[in-house]
Design a protein with these regions (language model features):
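Lipid interaction determinants
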Residues: 9, 19-77, 81-127
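Intrinsically disordered, low-complexity cationic segments
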Residues: 1-4, 22
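Alpha-helical transmembrane segments
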Residues: 13-17
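N-terminal export leaders
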Residues: 3-7, 12
Length: 127
């Protein structure tokens, strides 16, 4: 009887495993991939409840445009050693973020939290 339960449980585990997508886990992008994705493009997402757009210029300038706030101009770069995106704002200095490829697009990861976003080709901010 115990053997039959074990075999049933093993069969169920195999069945579930066979139908779990292989790409279900988010993967962190590398430095060269990030530079190519971001340069001359705009990220659109929601950060802590506020919609935003952020443009990444080829000269290392980034423009952060929150839906209900003041536009900020800062700097951006990719850290080749860590493979992370870094942004600089006068009020806080350099801050690093892992960038993940997800099932629905991309996400920033900072301090254990993820913030989904999509990338739009070109510049889609006012300034």
């Amino acid at each position: 009887m115990n053997r039959r339960h074990f075999i049933s449980a093993a069969a169920l585990a195999l069945f579930i495993g066979a139908y779990t997508p292989l790409h279900a886990q988010d993967t962190q992008l590398g430095a060269s991939e990030l530079a190519e994705l971001f340069t001359r493009n705009t990220a659109e997402g929601v950060w802590d409840g506020m919609a935003y757009k952020s443009y990444f210029g080829p000269d290392g300038v980034t423009i952060y445009d929150p839906q209900d706030g003041d536009m900020l101009v800062g700097k951006w770069r990719i850290n080749a050693e860590t493979g992370e995106y870094e942004s600089f704002w006068d009020a806080i200095g350099w801050t690093s973020y892992a960038v993940l490829r997800t099932q629905t697009g991309y996400a920033w990861r900072r301090n254990g939290k993820t913030y989904p976003f999509t990338l739009v080709e070109g510049r889609h901010v006012s300034q």
